[in-house]
Regions:
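Generic structural signal for small/hydrophobic residues in well-ordered secondary structure
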Residues: 7-8, 41, 78, 103
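A generic structural signal for short hydrophobic patches within well-formed alpha-helices
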Residues: 11, 38-41, 75, 117-118
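Short, polar loop motifs at secondary-structure junctions
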Residues: 15-18, 112-116
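Short loop/helix-cap segments at secondary-structure boundaries that form the rim of catalytic
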Residues: 22-26, 117-122
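Active-site neighborhoods of divalent-metal-dependent phosphate/nucleic-acid chemistry enzymes
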Residues: 67-111
Length: 127
């Protein structure tokens, strides 16, 4: 096991002061973030009415964590996960397949509030 990875919704809830998200992060000793999550946060900040302050907030928060880039191994796992979900007749957002693949590649638990991640084989999801 290689620590935990945070999904976007955990970060948003944590920054909004959500107690359950704070407990979730406090219970983990090693946390990383997929570069895909960074992109989702960037997009969310860009489209918000408080773009500049949100960009600063996210950058400051993310500076405390290791950012995991997408590499060839993650791309291969992405293909496997997407095919596995297709065979089950399950559709989840593309970015979430990438996030799941990143967590699987590192054998990390995924901290998320999205239940659809539980459809991914061999991915430990913590809410």
């Amino acid at each position: 096991m290689n620590g935990d990875m945070m999904d976007t919704n955990v970060i948003i809830k944590y920054l909004a002061g959500d107690i359950s998200a704070k407990r979730l992060l406090d219970s983990s000793s090693e946390i990383s973030v997929s570069v895909i999550v960074v992109g989702e946060l960037q997009y969310g900040a860009q489209k918000s009415t408080r773009s500049k302050s949100n960009l600063e907030l996210f950058a400051n928060f993310l500076s405390n964590f290791s950012i995991v880039p997408v590499d060839e191994n993650i791309a291969k796992i992405y293909g496997e996960v997407k095919d596995q979900l297709r065979k089950k007749g399950i559709n989840i957002p593309e970015n979430d397949i990438w996030i799941a693949a990143t967590a699987k590649s590192r054998q990390s638990r995924l901290l998320t509030y999205d239940a659809h991640f539980r459809s991914v084989d061999d991915l430990e999801v913590v809410s």
